[in-house]
Amino acid sequence: VLARTQRITRGIDYRSIVRRGSRRAGALHVVHVIDTGESRPPRFGFIVSKAVGNAVTRNTVRRRLKAICLEATPRLRPGADVVIRAFPASAEAAYADLRHDVVRGLERKAAA
């Protein structure tokens, strides 16, 4: 479970990261990253739209993304704000494929 300090909760933060952050698209998602320069753990936010599936499917995808990000946190820059937007294909993807795709995107954009 991501700690409260590792979550992006405000809508204005989501908007600024998506609009001004650098991004990298994978086959299953898009990673948006802004480096704030602060000395705190990276923060994560997730966008999983209704196009991904019903509520159960969306929450499953969100839980998978959270687990992947928690695992990748030690390899990321302190102060990075990361928003991951899931594509509909992520609902059908195997966990290993989703993990590979997300970790590759995070390492290219937010690695320490």
Label the model's feature ranges:
Residues 1-112:
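Positively charged, solvent-exposed patches that mediate nucleic-acid binding
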